[in-house]
Structures are given as structure tokens and as C-alpha cells.
Amino acid sequence: MKVYLVGGAVRDRLLGIPVQEQDWVVVGATPEELLKRKYRQVGRDFPVFLHPETKEEYALARTERKSAPGYYGFICDFSESVTLEEDLARRDLTINAMAMDEQGNLIDPYQGQRDLEEKLLRHVSSAFVEDPVRVLRVARFASRFHHLGFRIANETRLLMYSMVKQGELAHLIPERVWQEWQKSLEEKNPEQFILSLRSCDALRVILPEINSLFGVPNPHQYHQEIDTGIHSLMTLRASSELSEEPLVRFAALVHDLGKASTPIQAWPKHHGHEEEGTKLIRALCARLRIPNDYRDLAVTVARAHLNIHRLCELRPNTIVKLLEQVDAFRRPQLFHKILIACQADAESCGKTVVYRQTQLWNEILSECVKVTPQTFIVQGYEGKAIKEAMHQSRVACVERIMTSWKSNEK
């Protein structure tokens, strides 16, 4: 029985970046042998075991043979005769198909180290086409390593394109699409996930709602980049510089989703795209089974972002209503996320003007939250009268703040 460190841990060691988790492959062993050594089996479709002390994953070396379309259509062989090279051959990219033995010697049958040096994301073999999830994984690794200068090898991109044309992506299950997309939202360059899928025509199949934004014009006076798809990616990029939270990044990306559905004859104007966008976001989240917290933040940003930008043009009553609608008084941290997504939208336009709205909205909120029910309860207010009195008091508060702003500008 021989044990090898494999996959991402080897790759990251060679890149000199922190190793998040270690996975191991066991060659020349049986499930019974590992169970005798107190390993605990957790794999359902093939034997994966947890080390009795470290709790790290140990998998028996295996081969995979395509037996049916889609992600689950494989027959696995994990007999004692399977070699390490055979196990590494089933992996997606050469940089993920390296191993180290217990003495630290590198086993690299598919030139992964060379591709690390050349900063290439290259498939291991033609078996790449057997698993449609690999298209998503390559796009995710592009988002992870873009800042290091990595790019997808031309031959791998062509293979991804052929998989799209052959309809392989139709077998992707919604949960796996979201799993890879969500992971990409946590990377340094989440926009590269979208760009990589678009470069092989996979975006049209996997995320048609986002793909349809490309080619939709924006008013030049507000958007120097003009194209809505490009603007959405610029907003995603800007949001990743402002926040590490994938919820915020997702909301930033889809905030203008409704622009592809506005009447073409009205372009480049997009009246009503906010509400149209909320419908598309809800449908997208339902289709891919995206968690409710992602959906709710994205819907709120899509609906409110224009009014957030136009703060100084709004009436005090409208401002208080907006704060009530987004639940800012009870959930100020949620409102903070909304403001970050809106700031990303504004800053993505390439303007050098500082986005003052974040500071101004926070100033209003910090004063308005000082208005509490107790003030009106002791005055004899009851029921809905308390809510209305609080609303009017907050409106008066906003009026005072805005008057102060105007006097300071003189």
C-alpha cells in the first residue's frame, strides 16, 4: 500500500501559495485494509475514507469509464491493480494531475509542472469531454488564477467549445452549476468565470440571462463602455475590490439583468428595467436553486439601485420609504451590502467622481434609527399610529439633514 498527496495541494505547494486542504490517493489497497486501520468510509459511489487522526480524505486509486451522458454516467474501477498514473489521468487539468510521495518526490506524468511555469490551464486528455462539469471547473480556475497570469490553453478552449456544440452541457444539474459559480464568486477575479464561459459559447447555454446582456447598448453619458454585458462584468470586478462577500458580488453582477428585456425601439434607454430585472433574477435563482439570501439581496439591489444613486434628487418622504422597503432600520448590515453593490455599479462606469452616496445614506440611516417607538408610546400612540408617527419623524429628520447639506454646499 502506497499513499500519495494529490491534486490541489501539490499544485498550490509548487505555486507557493497556502494549501487549504490535503487530499490523498492510496494505491494497492482495498477498502477492507483501510477499515482495519480505523479509517472511516464516507464515499458513496467510490471508496473515500477519513484518516482516523487528521480527518483528511484518502481515496483509493480509481479509473472512470463513461457509461451514460451527464455527471453521474461513469463506471469506476478501484481495484488494487489501478496505478497512480491511471488515477491521475482521469483528472481535469494537468496542474491538478500531479502527486507527491511520502518523501516529497514529484510524480508528474502529464507535465503539470511545465504548465504551471507557462501559466496554462490545459486538459489532461481527450477524456476531458466526458464530464460537462469540467467546463465550469476550468472557468472557475480561470477566475482563481487570473491574477497570477494564467490563461486557458487554446486546445482546451476548443475542446470546451466542442462540448457545447455537442450538447454535453445540457446534462449539467442545476446544483452543480451554482456550486461552481458560487465558488468563482469567492475568487480574486470572479468576472473571469463569466468571460471564460462566454469565450467557448457555454454562457449562452448555462447562463442565458447574463449572455443576453452582451450587445445591449447603454446611454453613453452614463456608461462609457456602452455594452450592458461589459458593464455588468465591470461592476462585478468593482464589487470584488470593495467586498469579499459572494452575495454582494452576485447582486452586483445581475443588477441590470432587466435591460435585455426592455423594448428594443427605446434603446439605449431602459425604462422599467429595475422591475423587469427582479423577475429575471427570481427565475434565474429558481432555475439554479440559488439560496434565498442571494436572491433577496440581488432583487433588492436591482429594484433600488437607481434611487440609491439619485439620493440628492429624492424627496425626504421617498428616502424614508426606500429605507423602510429595504428593511434598513431593522437590518442595517443588509443595507450596507446594498450600498456596496450600488457603489460598484457607479464606480464601474469609469468616472473619477467619488461615490458620496454611501456616506450620505449612512448619515441619514444613523440619524433615522434614533427614532424609536418608545418616544410615541409614552405619548399615548397605539398600533398603526406609532408606525405613522415614526415615519413622519424620520421624514422630518431627513429634511433637516438635506437642508444642512445644501447650506454646506453654498
From Swiss-Prot:
Family stated for the protein in its record: Belongs to the tRNA nucleotidyltransferase/poly(A) polymerase family. Bacterial CCA-adding enzyme type 1 subfamily.
UniProt keyword NADP, yes or no: no
HD domain segment(s): 228-329
NCBIfam families found in the cross-reference section: PRK10885.1
Protein name: Multifunctional CCA protein
Role this protein plays: Catalyzes the addition and repair of the essential 3'-terminal CCA sequence in tRNAs without using a nucleic acid template. Adds these three nucleotides in the order of C, C, and A to the tRNA nucleotide-73, using CTP and ATP as substrates and producing inorganic pyrophosphate. tRNA 3'-terminal CCA addition is required both for tRNA processing and repair. Also involved in tRNA surveillance by mediating tandem CCA addition to generate a CCACCA at the 3' terminus of unstable tRNAs. While stable tRNAs receive only 3'-terminal CCA, unstable tRNAs are marked with CCACCA and rapidly degraded.
Origin: domain of life: Bacteria
One annotated GO molecular function: cyclic-nucleotide phosphodiesterase activity
InterPro entries per record: CCA_bact, HD/PDEase_dom, HD_domain, NT_sf, PolA_pol_head_dom, PolyA_RNA-bd, tRNA_CCA-adding_enzyme
Misc. remarks from the entry: A single active site specifically recognizes both ATP and CTP and is responsible for their addition.
UniProt binding sites for CTP: 8, 11, 91, 137, 140
Enzyme Commission number(s) from the entry: 2.7.7.72, 3.1.3.-, 3.1.4.-
Record's keyword terms, sorted: ATP-binding, Hydrolase, Magnesium, Metal-binding, Multifunctional enzyme, Nickel, Nucleotide-binding, Nucleotidyltransferase, RNA repair, RNA-binding, Transferase, tRNA processing
Cofactor note: Magnesium is required for nucleotidyltransferase activity.
Record-listed Mg(2+) binding positions: 21, 23
Catalytic activity: a tRNA precursor + 2 CTP + ATP = a tRNA with a 3' CCA end + 3 diphosphate; a tRNA with a 3' CCA end + 2 CTP + ATP = a tRNA with a 3' CCACCA end + 3 diphosphate
Coiled coil: none
Cofactor(s) needed for function: Mg(2+); Ni(2+)
Free-text domain note: Comprises two domains: an N-terminal domain containing the nucleotidyltransferase activity and a C-terminal HD domain associated with both phosphodiesterase and phosphatase activities.
Binding-site positions, ATP: 8, 11, 91, 137, 140
A GO biological process held by the record: RNA repair
Assembly information from the UniProt record: Monomer. Can also form homodimers and oligomers.
Pfam families named among the record's database cross-references: HD, PolyA_pol, PolyA_pol_RNAbd
Encoding gene per record: cca
